[in-house]
Amino acid sequence: MKDLYSRRINYMRISITDLCNLRCQYCMPAEGICKKDHKEVLTLEEITDIVKAGVGLGIDKVRITGGEPLVRNGIVEFIQMISNIDGIKDIAITTNGILLPRYAEALKEAGLKRVNISIDSLNPDKYREITRGGDLSKVLEGINECIRLGLTPVKLNVVAIGGYNDDEIEDFIQLTMDKPIDVRFIELMPIGEASQWGKDRFISNEEIVHRFKNLVPMETEKSSPAKYYQLPGGMGRVGLINPISSHFCGDCNRVRLTSDGKLKPCLHSNHEIDILDAVRNHPEKIQEVLASAILSKPEKHDLLTDSHEESNRGMSQIGG
C-alpha cells in the first residue's frame, strides 16, 4: 500500500515489549520502567493477527524490537508464527545481544533471517558503565554465534556519543574488514532519556566521513535509512544513519506497532492510532485501522522545527 506521498509501505517494526535487561543511560532510567498490566499488552497471537492483516496491505518485511525482545516469553514460537504467514519475506530482530548465545540457533530454525545488535563500546568497562551493568563478553559471543549460524551480515548499531565512544569509531570500522559485519553509526536522537542526557554529546555522522577518508561510498537501497561505505577490500560495510543532520523521510517505508497496541506512523511524532480495541473487539477492522495509520504518515518529521513536541515515549517503548 502507498501512503499519501506515494511511498510504498511494506515494513512493520514491532515492539513486543518495553522491558529490558539493560539500563542504557540514553534509553532508560536506572530504576527501569513500570511494568504494564498484562491486559494492556498485546499477546503474541494478537500481534500475529495484525501482521496477517498487514500482509493484505503489502507488508512483507517485519522487524521485532523492544525494549529487549529476547526477554519476552515465547519469542522463538512467535518468530515461527510470523514465518508461517504467507507473504512475509523477511524477519529480522534488533537486540542488545546479551541473550543471543542462548537463543540464536533456535531463532534461526524458527525463521529469523537477520540480526541487528545494539553495542556502543568495545571496552568492557565503558560498556558496563553506559548499560549500567551489561556484560560485553556475552554480546561478543552472540555476534560470533550469529556469524557461525550464517545470520549475516550481522549489523551492529552504534550510537555515536561525544566524550564516550568517539575514540572507538576506528575500532568499530575495523571490524568490517575481515568479518561479515555491517557497523552502522546512528546519530543520538533526542527521544526520552536522551533528550536531556545527550544535549552536549551529539556527533554528526558527517564528522565520521571527514575523519575516515578511506571509506568508499556504496550503492544503497532507497528505503534504507543508512548510507553505506566500505573499507577497500573489506568484507562488511560501514553505515551512517543521520536522522538529525540528514533525514531519510522521503523514502520511509515503515509503520511501527508498540507493545501496548498503538500504531505510530512516524517515529518522531506523538501521533498514535489505537489498534488494541480492533484486535480484541472488532477483528474485521484490523486492516482498516492499519490502512488509516499508513495514510496518516506525515511527509517528514519535524524534529528541527519550532513546532516539534518532545516524545511522550522513551525509545524502549518504541523500539527505534
Curated annotation (Swiss-Prot):
Bound cofactor: record note: Binds 2 [4Fe-4S] clusters. Binds 1 [4Fe-4S] cluster coordinated with 3 cysteines and an exchangeable S-adenosyl-L-methionine and 1 [4Fe-4S] cluster coordinated with 3 cysteines and the GTP-derived substrate.
Pathway connected to this protein: Cofactor biosynthesis; molybdopterin biosynthesis
Reactions it catalyzes: GTP + AH2 + S-adenosyl-L-methionine = (8S)-3',8-cyclo-7,8-dihydroguanosine 5'-triphosphate + 5'-deoxyadenosine + L-methionine + A + H(+)
GO terms for biological process, alphabetical: Mo-molybdopterin cofactor biosynthetic process
UniProt GO MF annotations: 4 iron, 4 sulfur cluster binding; cyclic pyranopterin monophosphate synthase activity; GTP 3',8'-cyclase activity; GTP binding; metal ion binding; S-adenosyl-L-methionine binding
Binding locations of [4Fe-4S] cluster 2: 249, 252, 266
Binding site residues for [4Fe-4S] cluster 1: 20, 24, 27
Domain Radical SAM core: 4-227
Co-factor(s): [4Fe-4S] cluster
Residue positions binding S-adenosyl-L-methionine: 26, 67, 118, 189
Basic and acidic residues compositional bias, start-end: 300-312
Database matches in PROSITE patterns: MOAA_NIFB_PQQE, RADICAL_SAM
Domain of life assignment: Bacteria
Disordered as annotated region, ranges: 300-320
A UniProt-annotated Pfam family: Mob_synth_C
Keywords, alphabetical: 4Fe-4S, GTP-binding, Iron, Iron-sulfur, Lyase, Metal-binding, Molybdenum cofactor biosynthesis, Nucleotide-binding, S-adenosyl-L-methionine
SUPFAM superfamilies: Radical SAM enzymes
EC number(s) stated in the UniProt entry for this protein: 4.1.99.22
Family: Belongs to the radical SAM superfamily. MoaA family.
Subunit structure and binding partners: Monomer and homodimer.
Protein name: GTP 3',8-cyclase
Naturally occurring in which organism (per UniProt): Alkaliphilus oremlandii (strain OhILAs)
